[in-house]
Structures are given as C-alpha cells and as structure tokens.
C-alpha cells in the first residue's frame, strides 16, 4: 500500500489490514520505508509462493481539482514494489478514491474500484472479497481506459 502526494490515505492500509485480519487472514504489509533493499531482489518466486497465498496491491491516490491525473508511482529503486509476480501468485488490485488506475496495472487480472477510502468502503470491499456479499452495480466510469493496452483481455 502506498498513498499519494496529498498524504491521502495513511489509514487505508491499516483499515484494510485490520478488516482482513478480523476476517481470519494473516496479513503481511509491504513497508518500502523500512525494508532491506536487497530483500526485493534476493527473494525468489518459490520463496514468495511458499510465504504468500494472495497479494493485494492497494492504492489510495485520490484525484483533486488541481491534480486531475494521479498515477500509481512505484518506489524509485527499479520499481521494486511493482507486482512482477502476478502470473505466479494470485494478485488483486484495489483502487481507493481513483477509478482510473487500470491504466497503471493492466497486467493484474483482478481489479476492484472502491470509490472511497472510508472505513465503510474498506469493510464493504473485504466483505465482497471473502464472499459475504456480491459485487453489484455498474461502474460510473470507464475503468478500461478506452481499452488502452488491451486491459480488458489481460
């Protein structure tokens, strides 16, 4: 989890972790600020597959009147926190507060738009992920970004 330039969502990562933990999951959060730099490059895919059943990439990068284009920004060190393992470890992307992140992660086949970072929305998306309620409704925006890079077919 990484929030955007507004500092918009420093709590969403913790809210998501707590909701998943409450649902019975063991949650490890990737902390790019304190991790060992070599850790990213030394862990092989087999080690990661043993350690993780699922990867959830969550972004809370809200748009604003003077920031209408807000993109996912990976850490500077060779984009090391970009999910390069999506074909080996089931991976989902949850976008809070910005329905247009599909253009940044077309290689992740499960994409969920959660239009707010409120605790209510975090709890609701976890209920849907674990099957307590279904995904209903129709997106008010074009999450496929006009078929950029064939995202619909990834």
Model-flagged regions — what are they?
Residues 1-154:
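C-terminal non-catalytic regions of proteins with extracellular/luminal or membrane-system context
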């Amino acid at each position: 989890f990484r929030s955007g330039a507004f500092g918009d969502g420093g709590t969403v990562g913790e809210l998501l972790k707590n909701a998943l933990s409450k649902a019975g999951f063991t949650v490890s959060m990737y902390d790019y600020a304190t991790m060992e730099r070599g850790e990213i490059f030394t862990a092989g895919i087999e080690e990661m597959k043993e350690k993780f059943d699922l990867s959830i990439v969550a972004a809370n990068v809200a748009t604003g009147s003077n920031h209408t284009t807000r993109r996912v920004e990976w850490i500077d060190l060779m984009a090391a926190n970009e999910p390069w393992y999506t074909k080996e470890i089931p991976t989902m992307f949850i976008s809070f507060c910005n329905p247009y992140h599909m253009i940044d992660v077309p290689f992740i086949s499960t994409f969920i738009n959660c239009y707010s970072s409120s605790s209510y929305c975090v709890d609701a998306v976890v209920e849907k992920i674990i099957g307590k309620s279904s995904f209903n409704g129709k997106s008010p925006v074009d999450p496929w970004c006009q078929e950029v890079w064939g995202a619909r077919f990834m």
